Design a protein with these regions (language model features):
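Metal-dependent nuclease catalytic cores that hydrolyze phosphodiester bonds in DNA/RNA
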Residues: 1-109
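Nucleic-acid nuclease catalytic cores
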Residues: 91-179
Length: 180
């Protein structure tokens, strides 16, 4: 498998072409993440774990100690075994690697769920979702819907955390180059 681009590299390039070039050709000059950036990553992981509870009884593709090819193979194995929800489902098409936060499969159609820890849907998230759609469509999957799940900034927690109120989904079912 010869990867040319990942989802994160694609969105990095959309945000800053110089950053993409440096990431590919001169990694040593990039500033490593500071504690603030690490906290943002950790917050994203927490929100992602909460979002998985909206799609119970799923299986997770492990990140540690596996190659991307292992992740792709395991994803296909889980699909073949009939799992309805797969967390971090991994695919490659046309040299592009993607990991879908939550892949939901119903009636031979797939729903992509991209989880973000922000309170609104930014354009870069739509590009992120678009490349996931491109890859799955290219692999022959029938993509029913793409969702960007994010924090509801109007949510006020009561005694118990209500994940269905904390997280909102913005749904995109019309596809062009960019989901609109």
């Amino acid at each position: 498998m010869k990867l040319k681009l990942s989802k994160s590299l694609y969105t990095r390039g959309l945000q800053c072409q110089k950053s993409l070039w440096l990431k590919k050709h001169k990694k040593e000059v990039l500033t490593p993440p500071n504690s603030s950036a690490q906290a943002i990553f950790e917050n994203g992981n927490i929100v992602g774990d909460l979002a998985c509870k909206l799609f119970p009884n799923g299986v997770e593709i492990p990140f540690e100690n596996t190659t991307f090819q292992d992740k792709i193979t395991l994803t296909q194995d889980y699909i073949n075994q009939g799992y309805e929800n797969i967390y971090e489902a991994t695919f490659e098409f046309d040299g592009i690697l993607i990991m879908i936060d939550i892949l939901n499969i119903k009636d031979n159609r797939v729903i992509l769920n991209e989880v973000k820890s922000s309170t609104d849907v930014k354009d870069v998230y739509l590009h992120d979702a678009s490349i996931q759609y491109y890859v799955l469509n290219g692999l022959g999957y029938d993509v029913k819907q793409v969702n960007v799940i994010h924090i509801n900034n109007n949510y006020v927690r009561g005694e118990e955390l209500d994940i269905n109120q904390l997280l909102l989904g913005s749904f995109y079912t019309t596809f062009g180059f960019l989901l609109v």
